[in-house]
Amino acid sequence: MEISWGRAMWRNFLGQSPDWYKLALLVFLIINPFIFLANPFIAGWLLVAEFIFTLAMALKCYPLLPGGLLAIEAVIIGMTSAAHVREEVAANLEVLLLLMFMVAGIYFMKQLLLFIFTRLLLSIRSKMVLSLAFCVAAAFLSAFLDALTVVAVVISVAVGFYGIYHRVASSRGEENDMLDDSHIDPHYKTVLEQFRGFLRSLMMHAGVGTALGGVMTMVGEPQNLIIAKAAGWHFGDFFLRMSPVTVPVLVCGLLTCMLVEKMRWFGYGETLPEKVRDVLQQFDDQSRKKRTRQDKIKLIVQAIIGVWLVTALALHLAEVGLIGLSVIILATALTGVTDEHAIGKAFTESLPFTALLTVFFSIVAVIIDQHLFAPIIQFVLQASEHAQLTLFYLFNGLLSSISDNVFVGTIYINEAKAAMENGAISLKQFELLAVAINTGTNLPSVATPNGQAAFLFLLTSALAPLIRLSYGRMVWMALPYTIVLTLIGLLCVEFTLAPATEWMTQAGWLATLS
């Protein structure tokens, strides 16, 4: 019997999302206009809370859909205007270009990145050294590339290796289903569980590595570019200004990586079983024999393009997104990718998040029009200049760990810049606050998958169910990093940021906003 029209419409609304989630969103959409008529300020804060809720529930439904519905309603009922949304999007065009073109550009360098991580995995036998190598490699790559893409590459390596061993363990060849363990011998199952633990720890080290490297440069995370633009900093300025906080945090983060592996705390310390290593090594040897001269040329070309990418970013030869576009053109032209559909695949990872970021800017427009953050900013600005840095760092860290750090960073840097333009704080203080905001959004946000887009990408990937990586397990494994990164970042903001910045300014290393 066919279902009713109403039931069909209910099933279509937000698709596979739970009924309680659909009902919650409908309640939000119904009550918002009435609350806005009664009290616009409360309605604005309610909208922000609802939007954060959609981010926190990202595993139930991709936030673009519910967040987009809330944003459309906000424009319709007058919480902001379409013109203001357009202004916010135009002001952040560089960030949208970064997400569209840089992520797509790195897609065409995946072969090189896969080659690098495969070599690391098979050539280093010590688990502690291997974990450190993955963390450092992810940090370095994320400082110049997009963290999401770096994690995507590591996921590709892990899924590939897991599939190779799973096929051998199940003896089912190409027809093997990686989610089905029913055909695996009990002995192989024990080895497989150990292999899963090994991959889980490597993925978490790599994920945290993207946060350690991503906070250091203006292209490491989308919000970094927003903050750099607001402060008028280029690549070198941004790196130097962040370094009093980010360099000590990087060192302590790497020490944490070694400690948890050595002590086998928080689910770390599992080694690669020898039986698995033998299978993977055999497969890699076969792959290397099959590699043609044309394949080798592709790797060399991608490495040269990587040098161009780093050089262009460091010397600020063009806007970041345009450098990404140049990578797409060079990588496709010189490696023989000419089919439109093959090129189109490169954009599938970035465009949903680009659309979500545009919705962020709609919510930011509401926050500005309704003056939602004015009381918080006034409270922070009433404190001493030294205390302001700590408060901005803590407020950003708390919100970023439950919400999305791009959203939080955008709001706070806009408010800090407005305070400077109104004469509430000096230029020097604004530049220090920009560092506190950037580090506050990037470091504590490793606490949950909600805060870091790369973590959320890992949690929702095809790899997570294979290696039994759940939301709770991710939070638990991230806990030592969360504690160390947050506390060291706070201490550096408190004690080293101002004196180190003053020293670099006097030495003539730093440019200031004019």
Swiss-Prot record:
Subcellular location: Cell inner membrane
Described function: Na(+)/H(+) antiporter that extrudes sodium in exchange for external protons.
Keyword Transport appears in the UniProt entry: yes
Keyword field contains Cell wall biogenesis/degradation: no
Name this protein carries in UniProt: Na(+)/H(+) antiporter NhaB
Molecular-function annotations in GO: sodium:proton antiporter activity
Keywords assigned by UniProt, alphabetized: Antiport, Cell inner membrane, Cell membrane, Ion transport, Membrane, Sodium, Sodium transport, Transmembrane, Transmembrane helix, Transport
Bilayer-crossing regions: 23-43, 63-83, 97-117, 120-140, 144-164, 202-222, 238-258, 303-323, 357-377, 391-411, 447-467, 475-495
Catalysed reactions listed for this entry: 2 Na(+)(in) + 3 H(+)(out) = 2 Na(+)(out) + 3 H(+)(in)
Organism (species): Salmonella paratyphi B (strain ATCC BAA-1250 / SPB7)
Source species, domain of life: Bacteria
Membrane topology: Multi-pass membrane protein
Pfam families: NhaB
Protein family: Belongs to the NhaB Na(+)/H(+) (TC 2.A.34) antiporter family.
GO cellular component, one term: plasma membrane
InterPro entries assigned: Na+/H+_antiporter_NhaB
